[in-house]
């Protein structure tokens, strides 16, 4: 944004625009400057920025609550976060917003207990993995834990040294599938099978360029941390060591952001159509309400955006990305522990498996308490789990864990179940990229289309996770602000 765009100048400009509203046919249903669709971190960050500059903004959220995939289950035992639990030390926008809104942060974030491994229903101690006859990997792979094999072949070998490396022209050379990359790196067939089981998706469908972006950002962020402290840990465990957490759960942050917007945030408003012409935009909602604005910002996952009728329609690589971007699912079953079962069998508490649950994570809170397990099913496993009622998912998870780990018998209690695919405002968890199209999509899909702008974690450029969402909201908000002043 230009340094000339001060709050005083913006408000003055907005006043002139408002004066013109009464004489313009496009001023219908309120004459907003911007309609923002989606009240996650990206949408609310953009709304706060634009509101501070004097813009007349309304935020429409289809769900009954703001926050997007940041959600603290306050009604569950110990109120776990279902997403957005870790605030990295480099999350400048998140940290600044928390400070500005007096949202209390605490040191550390939950981490997962070290892993044992369950391969073909056989429980293997971590120290026995390298010599196990079930470990069919070869060479140096044998010493690498199953849940960190992907990191060994991608994170440790990303060619990028700068956080914007994946945006440079030469990055197109790495627009490959994970299967292609692993073959180039000489990964054994057994290693590829393990990585496939860890992710839950065919390796041919996964973009290694997208994975390299995360890997590079993580590597740069962790460069000053003792390597021994990070050894043998997956990306989430490593992040937990250096992260902070929101006291009371991450929803306290998104609730505070929503509170600053007040009546400008409207929940239960599912957008069905975005109509644009030379004079402005009309946004129509399922309940019949219409909103008129100069610009629209769609801060939605593409899994949701592609269900909205956009006129005129998107074109080229941008249309292709919105229409075809794959989204994974993470179906979660949360359990309470009555006893420390790991003391019975002497094995590490968390489990990687190639069975019904990809990861069974025993959660160690920032204060050292250990009372929760999250059993996570990805992709095809998640589809099967999601077909069950919530209580049945709990019974299934307990029975499965007791079967593969007898020491857990009688010590687990169902807390709750959640699937991001079954949330209409999310329709999936993490976004993916189609191999061979990731580079083009990355450079096309975030560009404005007519009067429609875009934001969301999937439009990351330099950051990851919560900070990527905030980054994209800020970028779109500033771009729209510039236009409002012209």
Range-by-range predicted roles:
Residues 34-58:
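N-terminal Rossmann-like FAD-binding beta1-loop-alpha1 element of flavoenzymes
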Residues 275-290:
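Conserved beta-strand-loop-beta-strand element in the redox core of flavoprotein oxidoreductases
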Residues 37, 291-303:
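Short hydrophobic core segments
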Residues 298-314:
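Flavin (primarily FAD) binding-site architecture
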Residues 52-72:
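Glycine-rich FAD pyrophosphate-binding loop
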Residues 13-15, 53, 128, 280-282, ...:
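Conserved flavin/dinucleotide-binding core of flavoenzymes
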Residues 161-269, 278-280, 299, 433-434:
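Active-site/ligand-binding neighborhood in enzyme catalytic cores
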Residues 1-17:
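N-terminal secretory signal peptides and thylakoid transit peptides that target proteins
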């Amino acid at each position: 944004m230009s340094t000339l765009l001060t709050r005083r100048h913006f408000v003055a400009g907005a006043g002139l625009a408002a004066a013109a509203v009464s004489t313009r046919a496009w001023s219908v249903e309120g004459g907003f400057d911007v309609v923002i669709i989606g009240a996650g971190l990206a949408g609310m960050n953009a709304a706060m920025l634009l509101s501070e500059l004097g813009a007349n903004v309304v935020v429409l959220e289809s769900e009954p609550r703001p926050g997007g995939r940041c959600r603290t289950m306050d009604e569950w035992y110990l109120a776990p976060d279902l997403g957005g639990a870790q605030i990295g030390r480099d999350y400048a926008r998140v940290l600044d917003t928390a400070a500005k809104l007096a949202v209390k942060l605490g040191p550390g974030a939950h981490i997962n207990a070290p892993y044992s491994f369950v391969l073909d229903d056989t429980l293997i101690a971590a120290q026995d993995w390298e010599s196990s006859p079930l470990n069919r990997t070869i060479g140096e792979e044998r010493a690498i834990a199953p849940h960190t094999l992907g990191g060994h072949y991608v994170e440790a070998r990303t060619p990028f040294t700068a956080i914007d490396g994946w945006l440079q022209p030469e990055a197109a050379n790495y627009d490959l599938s994970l299967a292609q990359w692993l073959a180039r790196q000489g990964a054994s067939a057994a290693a590829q099978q393990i990585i496939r089981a860890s992710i839950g998706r065919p390796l041919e469908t996964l973009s290694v360029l997208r994975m390299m972006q995360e890997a590079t950002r993580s590597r740069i962020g962790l460069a000053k941390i003792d390597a021994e402290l990070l050894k043998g840990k997956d990306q989430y465990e490593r992040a937990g060591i250096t992260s902070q957490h929101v006291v009371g759960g991450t929803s306290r942050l998104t609730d505070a952001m929503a509170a600053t917007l007040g009546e400008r945030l409207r929940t239960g408003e599912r957008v069905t159509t975005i109509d644009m012409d030379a004079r402005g935009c009309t946004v129509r909602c399922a309940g019949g309400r219409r909103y008129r604005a100069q610009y629209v910002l769609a801060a939605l996952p593409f899994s949701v955006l592609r269900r909205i009728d956009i006129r005129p329609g998107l074109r080229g690589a941008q249309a292709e990305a919105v229409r075809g971007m794959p989204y994974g699912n993470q179906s979660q079953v949360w359990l309470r522990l009555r006893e420390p079962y790991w003391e019975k069998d002497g094995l590490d508490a968390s489990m990687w498996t190639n069975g019904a649950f990809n990861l069974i994570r025993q959660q160690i809170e920032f204060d050292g308490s250990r009372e929760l397990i999250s059993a996570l099913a990805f992709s095809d496993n998640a589809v099967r789990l999601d077909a069950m009622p919530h209580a049945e998912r709990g019974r299934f998870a307990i029975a499965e864990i007791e079967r593969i780990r007898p020491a857990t018998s009688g010590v687990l209690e169902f807390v709750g179940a959640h699937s991001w695919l079954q949330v209409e405002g999310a329709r999936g968890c993490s976004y993916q990229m189609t191999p061979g199209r990731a580079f083009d999509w990355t450079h096309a899909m975030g560009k404005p289309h007519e009067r429609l702008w875009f934001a969301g974690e999937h439009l990351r450029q330099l950051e990851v996770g919560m900070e990527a969402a905030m980054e994209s909201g800020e970028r779109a908000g500033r771009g729209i602000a510039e236009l409002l002043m012209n």
